[in-house]
Amino acid sequence: MANPFVRNQSFKSVFFKNLVGITLWVPVLMFVEQHVVSVGTIEGRSMKPAFNPETNMLQRDRVLLWKWNKDYKRGDVVILRSPENPEELLVKRVLGVEYDIMKTRPPKKLSLVPVPEGHVWVEGDEQFHSIDSNKFGPVSTGLITAKVIAILFPFSRAGRIDHEGFRKNAVFLSGKRSVK
């Protein structure tokens, strides 16, 4: 006797039903990847030792990128479009926020640079191998595409990003509105 609860469905109808179900999720997943969270690879050595501490550069850090929040604080590591070449993505640490006055570092002449509203001051952790705000000045927050929130790989270094490991003496004078 046949089981009345088992429907006799053809392979074709099951396939198309599953295909429609999967297809409905594609736009959702694309939105999440483009606007909320994604995985990226850190290239180069400008953020050593926080990222890519190995000298051979064969093993690059894989990181979790958060794209939703646009509130940047000192110590955040961000992905941004280069002000000099918008096709190029940079990884830098936010050292100054709007209304701060930043002291540039050598070899640039000692000078004080105010960070205007809607901008941040970014630098690489490895100061001798970094092209950053010391070269191109404060960066519009509109150029920032994501915040790095965790290292995923290598597993030996996996975990949340240290936001306290930045040059605390970078800020010469904090602006009133930026102090929290």
From Swiss-Prot:
It is found in: Mitochondrion inner membrane. InterPro entries: IMP2, LexA/Signal_pep-like_sf, Pept_S26A_signal_pept_1, Peptidase_S26. Keywords: Hydrolase, Membrane, Mitochondrion, Mitochondrion inner membrane, Protease, Transmembrane, Transmembrane helix. Its EC number is 3.4.21.-. Coiled coil: none annotated. Catalyzes the removal of transit peptides required for the targeting of proteins from the mitochondrial matrix, across the inner membrane, into the inter-membrane space. Belongs to the peptidase S26 family. IMP2 subfamily. This is Mitochondrial inner membrane protease subunit 2.
